[in-house]
């Protein structure tokens, strides 16, 4: 029973661990489900923007950390028993080295490049260096394999996705932009999420903005509870409500069906 609980916790937090199969696939199932879905998405080599839209699960994702608001965001998520995913900028880990391990208690972690440059302006070799350096820093800080990648500004093309896929990372975008990076007020952030949220949504937020953290506490998490939506990490969303091939090929339109 204890091993089953460990497996469930692993999928919830995005920890990619396989239990020994000798005691049966039922016990290894949750982590295996994540690995199978990651492998499928890597073969398809298309950006993920949402889940399959067939569940009550939603994924809150936070870019550009770690930073001064990271601890507060974690406390707010913990009080609400909520899960999330943090896409980390490699160079920031030098200033906040302990944050990634703390984030793992409630969240999955992803690669958001080392310098947060527009990858469309870089050659493939430089893109690879950005991703490899950040992945190595996160894995050194946590001991956990990084399998998710998000390009800064959402600026991407098939070549960028191919570099990430060759490194074993699934490219993840979003279906809801909270507009917090544009300077939206905390009330406007909450209103934007409220207008679009549904089961299967992937929400773009930023953990280095005070107005975002306030919106998370006072508007977004209460809204999700009121609508009976459940926050999960991205690996859990992908395993429990995976997007179809047709959705992936349709891009953003595939999240509006």
Each model region followed by its residue ranges:
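Low-complexity, Gly/Ser/Thr/Pro-rich intrinsically disordered linker/tail segments
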Residues: 222-257
């Amino acid at each position: 029973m204890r091993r089953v609980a460990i497996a469930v916790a692993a999928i919830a937090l995005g920890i990619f661990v396989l239990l020994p199969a000798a005691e049966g696939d039922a016990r290894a199932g949750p982590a295996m489900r994540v690995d199978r879905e990651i492998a499928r998405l890597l073969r398809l080599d298309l950006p993920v923007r949402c889940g399959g839209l067939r569940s009550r699960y939603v994924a809150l994702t936070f870019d550009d950390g770690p930073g001064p608001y990271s601890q507060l965001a974690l406390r707010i998520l913990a009080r609400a028993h909520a899960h999330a995913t943090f896409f980390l900028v490699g160079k920031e880990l030098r200033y906040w080295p302990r944050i990634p391990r703390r984030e793992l208690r409630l969240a999955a972690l992803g690669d958001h490049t080392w310098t947060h440059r527009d990858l469309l302006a870089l050659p493939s070799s430089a893109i690879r260096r950005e991703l490899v350096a950040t992945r190595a820093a996160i894995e050194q800080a946590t001991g956990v394999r990084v399998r998710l990648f998000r390009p800064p500004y959402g600026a991407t093309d098939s070549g960028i996705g191919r570099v990430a896929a060759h490194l074993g990372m699934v490219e993840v975008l979003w279906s809801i932009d909270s507009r917090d990076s544009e300077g939206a007020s905390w009330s406007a952030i909450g209103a934007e999420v409220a207008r679009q949220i549904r089961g299967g949504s992937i929400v773009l937020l930023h953990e280095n903005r005070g107005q975002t953290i306030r919106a998370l506490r006072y508007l977004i998490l209460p809204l999700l509870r009121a609508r009976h939506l459940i926050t999960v990490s991205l690996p859990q969303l992908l395993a429990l409500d995976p997007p179809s091939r047709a959705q992936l090929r349709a891009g953003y339109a595939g999240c509006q069906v």
